[in-house]
Amino acid sequence: MRELFMYLFLLFLVLCVKSVYSTPTREQFQNCLSTKQFNSTLKNPINLTTHTLDSRVHTDFSESSSPNSSFLNLNFTSLKPILIVKPKSESEIKQSILCSRKLGVQVRTMSGGHDYEGLSYLSLSPFIIVDLVNLRSISINLTDETAWIQSGATLGEVYYKIAKTSKIHAFAAGICPSVGVGGHISGGGFGTIMRKYGLASDNVVDARLMDVNGKTLDRKTMGEDLFWALRGGGAASFGVVLSWKVKLARVPEKVTCFISQHPMGPSMNKLVHRWQSIGSELDEDLFIRVIIDNSLEGNQRKVKSTFQTLFLGGIDRLIPLMNQKFPELGLRSQDCSEMSWIESIMFFNWRSGQPLEILLNRDLRFEDQYFKAKSDYVQKPVPENVFEEVTKRFLEQDTPLMIFEPLGGKISKISETESPYPHRRGNLYNIQYMVKWKVNEVEEMNKHVRWMRSLHDYMTPYVSKSPRGAYLNYRDLDLGSTKGINTSFEDARKWGETYFKGNFKRLGLVKGKIDPTNFFRNEQSIPPLF
């Protein structure tokens, strides 16, 4: 009898513990969203779009690391989201935050789903996804040359709206049309006119954020410290950015683009080496990036370098400038094409001549591919022999990639403490490393990831040091990750200072004020510092 009593008592304890710590179900979350407490601000609670779990997306989440099988998370196994929330109003975002707090689940906010490690749609802990796809309005004011952009908009949607409104305006941001504005801006935002106008985050003049209590703040009510943190510090650590107000950039009606491709070899190595010394020092109107990749010619792999260029002016200005600063490239007028700024976006996406409406396609991503990426900053020209070794290593892979993005210009004129993005003066260019593959198997993944890590290790002597810099928007969990809600600030320094250098401490202090319980967190979020 005593044994039976003990058994029943232990069973009771187990059931109690299970009830306390069990993961909330989809139905529980829906019930929370449907209660009067959370629906008081809605005119018609029955029509809540938050009660959706897209079956296609849900299936893909269970089979891969992203909604479109384009991104790979290498460092942790994801749980399926309890719910994919697709709010149609800001009040529904508030409901999602409050219910998540009540039920003890994390919130992952997804703007475009391009986080390189999947942190906008993956988690080790029980979580929901707040997909901002329905909140993507764009309001342009040409009088003061600004735009209010909701975080669910993609860069392609923003560019299309600008182009339909003005022939002489642009926005200083990236070239990938399907990238979401929310994450891109909050991580910095490289682009083809950044040497003239700075990063996307440098052009933010106001923002609206929903905090952990569901309160909406703008620049005035959030204060300058939090506004500073959002512009390059990764907004997902602080709340849900609802919208950004950005400065538009003036561009000429006609810009000039050209592509110059060459097989890698001694002469090409000299060209790339020469570019390193001048890319960041050229006229601010001139952006020349270098892409190193390979292709199959017959049964043989060939490594090539491509100089991809945008000039904010005509051919008649560009040719003399190139002859003076970079005559080694041998640029001719017939190599160049004049076009509108919006056409240059198509050009950089290898889609010249296609309808502009393709920019509105939110699914323009790598097709059926997985990848691993890393980044670096170069402060002194890399020796020529390094490119010889890179060429040898590229011949081992089907789809390796290195992209050199020139810095300098406006980027270097901004203090490294003016925003969380610190990689300013003294940096010649950024390197993005990437390797892609199609077979979704562990052995295949490990083979390519080992290759990527080996290349990154090889480059160690030639890139920035103390700390070795990295770019947040090319997120890399190899740098380190948090250990849940109780991760110490000191533990996070290893990767935090890699992205933010000395700004990491200030980000922690801001986090401690706006989100002291660390509700908004992921595997590389900012821990609170008090």
UniProtKB/Swiss-Prot annotation:
It is an enzyme of class 1 (oxidoreductase). There is a cross-link at H114-C176 (6-(S-cysteinyl)-8alpha-(pros-histidyl)-FAD (His-Cys)). Glycans are attached at N39, N47, N68, N75, N141, N486. It is found in: Secreted, Cell wall. It comes from the Eukaryota. Disulfide bonds join C32-C99. GO terms for biological process: cellular response to hypoxia; positive regulation of hydrogen peroxide biosynthetic process; response to jasmonic acid. Residues 1-22 form the signal peptide. Keywords: Cell wall, Disulfide bond, FAD, Flavoprotein, Glycoprotein, Nucleotide-binding, Oxidoreductase, Secreted, Signal. Induction: By jasmonic acid (e.g. 12-oxo-phytodienoic acid OPDA). GO terms for molecular function: FAD binding; oxidoreductase activity. Its cofactor is FAD. The FAD cofactor is bound via a bicovalent 6-S-cysteinyl, 8alpha-N1-histidyl FAD linkage. Residues 77-251 form the FAD-binding PCMH-type domain. Belongs to the oxygen-dependent FAD-linked oxidoreductase family. This is Berberine bridge enzyme-like 22. The gene is FAD-OXR.
